[in-house]
């Protein structure tokens, strides 16, 4: 594959890399000649990886352990890991889908990145219209630590099932990415938030079930091209 994006030799970290979009991202980066570190709950089986590191992104201590084995300089970070909420509780879903990315950014990426580096969060169309929900998002997005984020989340009047944590996390992710694009942009670090519609990954069946069928899901999310 021709390296139009200049990834040759770049140190890249990809979360959620054992399947779906994360796996596809890691494969492409390896093909482009990047030094790829795959971080996921299951082993990432790609020839040419620099390392495959096991990590449950919903747990702070496992993130700390994973980053202890990652390089002191990172050129590109791809936060792809996510849970739908159909098989996990509210807090676990939210921590994997939002808190982990915020913690990694604040605790590690700001210290291991510099001018010319980039951060890409893979969210979804569930994060659209986040601007309309700032009042409920602000305290969570602006919480100073992992523990403070959980405390702020716990104070919200939420009685919805765990799959709503997916939606709320994606809205928070959209707001956080927009704010960090401005803040980290001052240091020359580029921040993007990718928001695909329905995509053929392992979680698609879970989303179809929660939405009430394939057509209902497509009507709600659209299709990623």
Describe each region flagged by the PLM.
Residues 58-73:
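Conserved Rossmann-fold cofactor-binding substructure of NAD(P)-dependent oxidoreductases
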Residues 85-87, 117-186, 198:
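Catalytic loop of short-chain dehydrogenase/reductase
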